[in-house]
Amino acid sequence: MESKLVVALDLMKESDLLGIAGKIGSQVFAIKLNWPAILVSGSRIIRDVSRYSRVICDFKVADIPNTNSLITEKVLEMGAWGIISHSFTGHDSLGAVIESAGDMRVFSVVSMSHPGSAEFINPNTDRLLEMSIRAGAAGFIAPGNNPAEISRIKKMAPGKIIMTPGVGAQGGKAGDAIHAGADLVIVGRSVYASHDPVEQVENLNREINSSV
């Protein structure tokens, strides 16, 4: 069974990031890279990590359409499998990401897992989701520490990929997220900050597989 685990490697030391990527790459669905890795190592880190696993660039793209297109085109050029974009900037900005993505999957943020998301993003989840579906997003980001919301979003977006952060350090459980309807579960600190990332990945894969 293919893994449903996406590991976020938000590390500021390139050797540590690549070391863990090399150890776990074959056991996960994808490795997620955020701005810390890019700021330290440059965009080439996308290609370097792609040697070990699919790469999802969690850039939460949120600018005017032209800038969004430039960012997305570069990420595609570097070989990423997917990119995460905000949707609150509107249909034209999200549409620019999707139009520039080629065969790269675009995941739209429609709900988040941290406390501050209750102020603006989460109250508008339904509108963001409906707009993102019309724009052609491949999938959505839903909070892994809120199984009820995962289930609700899954029902509203049948056939779309639901990817969930908020598992591990933010309190969510991988098995609960999968049982609620998540297709992919994102885990970061619980893996890369553990004394044995490989063992932690194996444990998470077992937990996820038992919930499928």
Regions found by a protein language model. Give the residues of each.
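Conserved anion-binding
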Residues: 2-5, 63-147, 159
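Active-site beta-loop-alpha junctions enriched in small/polar residues
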Residues: 8-12, 34-38, 60-62, 88, ...
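N-terminal active-site wall of soluble small-molecule enzyme domains
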Residues: 17-18, 22-24, 33-77, 116, ...
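Alpha-helix-loop-beta-strand connector modules within alpha/beta enzyme cores
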Residues: 39-60, 99-109, 151-167, 204-212
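A C-terminal functional module that forms or caps the active site or interfaces directly
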Residues: 137, 144-191
